[in-house]
Design a protein with these regions (language model features):
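Conserved SGNH/GDSL esterase-like catalytic core that processes O-acyl groups on lipids
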Residues: 2-3, 8-107, 142-148, 152, ...
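Surface-exposed acidic, glycine-flexible loop patches that form ligand/cofactor-binding
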Residues: 67-76, 123-128, 199-202
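Aromatic/hydrophobic pocket-lining residues that form the small-molecule binding cavity
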Residues: 114, 118, 185
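Generic structural signal for well-ordered alpha-helices
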Residues: 118-123, 155
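A short helix->loop->beta-strand "cap" motif at the edges of active sites that frequently abuts
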Residues: 129-134
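Short helix-capping segments at alpha-helix termini
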Residues: 159-164
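Short glycine-rich catalytic loops that host catalytic nucleophiles or stabilize transition states
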Residues: 169-174
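Histidine-centered active-site loop/cap adjacent to the catalytic His
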Residues: 177-202
Length: 202
C-alpha cells in the first residue's frame, strides 16, 4: 500500500500507506479467506531499493533478523499470489544505483538471468507449498505498460516450470502517476477476483 493515500507527491511516509486497502487485502476479504501477507515497499527478486531481496526475506518472522525463521508448517494457503518485479524493472536500468552495483556489479542481468531468477523464486514457493495454487501476478504500474518485456519474462518462467497449478495474471496498466491509489487498488482487486473465480478451484 505504498503511497496509497498520497495523490500529489507519491511519498513513502507511513501515514500514506495502508495494507488494508490494497488489492491483496480486498481480494482476501471478498473470498472471506485467511490473509497472510509478506511484503515490503521497494523490494524485488533480484534487486531492491535497499540491501535485501525477497528471496532473503520471505521466510523470516522478523524481516530484519536473518536468524528469525517463520515455521511454514503453521499455515498452508490454498492460493499464493506472487506480485514482484516492479522494483527490479526500474533498478536494472540504473547502473549508478548502489544496489545495482551491489547485486550486479557493472552489467545488468540478461533476459535469461531475469527469467531464471524469477523461476527460481517461484520454484522455492512451490517447494514450500507443494499443494497450493500459485498466481504469478504483475501489478498495474508501468511493468504492464504496452511494450514492456516483463510480462513475457514471467510467462516464460512459468512455462518452463511445467506446473499446471501455477498461473499468470497481469493487471492492465493504470496509466497514471505514481503508485496505485485506493481506486486503482480496487481495480486490481476486481481483476484478480475475476481471475480467481474463472481459473482457481478452491
Amino acid at each position: 500500500g505504498y503511497a496509497i493515500y498520497d495523490s500529489v507527491k507519491d511519498y513513502y511516509f507511513g501515514y500514506y500507506e495502508n495494507n488494508y486497502e490494497t488489492y491483496a487485502a480486498l481480494t482476501a476479504r471478498h473470498f472471506n479467506a485467511q490473509y497472510h501477507c509478506t511484503a515490503k515497499s521497494g523490494i524485488g527478486i533480484m534487486v531492491s531499493w535497499f540491501p535485501m531481496i525477497m528471496p532473503e526475506m520471505y521466510d523470516r518472522l522478523d524481516a530484519t533478523d536473518s536468524t528469525s525463521k517463520w515455521d511454514f508448517s503453521k499455515y498452508t494457503p490454498d492460493v499464493v499470489v506472487i506480485n514482484l518485479l516492479q522494483n527490479d524493472s526500474w533498478i536494472v536500468t540504473m547502473s549508478d544505483q548502489p544496489e545495482f552495483k551491489h547485486r550486479f556489479g557493472t552489467a545488468a542481468p540478461t533476459e535469461s538471468e531475469v527469467i531464471d531468477a524469477y523461476k527460481k523464486f517461484v520454484q522455492t514457493i512451490r517447494d514450500t507449498y507443494p499443494k497450493s495454487q500459485i498466481i504469478c501476478m504483475l501489478g498495474n504500474m508501468d511493468i504492464t505498460k504496452k511494450g514492456s518485456p516483463w510480462p513475457g519474462y514471467v510467462d516464460d518462467a512459468v512455462k518452463q516450470l511445467h506446473d499446471k497449478k501455477i498461473f499468470t495474471f497481469f493487471s492492465p496498466y493504470k496509466d497514471t502517476y505514481g503508485h496505485p491509489k485506493v481506486r486503482e487498488q480496487k481495480a486490481m482487486a476486481d481483476g484478480l477476483i475475476k481471475f480467481i473465480d474463472e481459473n482457481i478451484k478452491w
